[in-house]
């Protein structure tokens, strides 16, 4: 067997961001993938509250998930949205747990924004198809299609 490889040398190769957050919600560590996932360099996130980055509409459900994690519940598939540094929205899937011994939350964040866009497009295509097949008149069909397209914007 070869020499032991220090974790830092391969953690920064991960495509997903590894995050460590303390009990009070402050980021204590985030891997280099934070730039790809959140749009922030690690040093821009460390020391800040993780909730500062959460999309305002997702704050309450995120706070609830944090409470559950702090009670020891595992969260393998929690999704919420973050506001990237450039102002765009990132859809994030989290896998997280609490370490009572270390008093930290350890989580892996995966950017699922492209998947969410594809799902929205697929749902829109179904809705447009449904409108085309079920509308009684052209104006009604156009109104429904316009509503669907507007929802994508």
Q: What is each PLM-predicted segment?
A:
Residues 34-45, 56:
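PAS/PAS-like sensory domain cap-loop motif
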Residues 1-8, 61, 110-121, 151:
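PAS-associated C-terminal cap
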Residues 113-134, 139-140:
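Signal-transmission linkers at sensory-effector interfaces
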Residues 26, 71-74, 78-92, 103:
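Per-ARNT-Sim (PAS) sensory domains and their PAS-associated C-terminal
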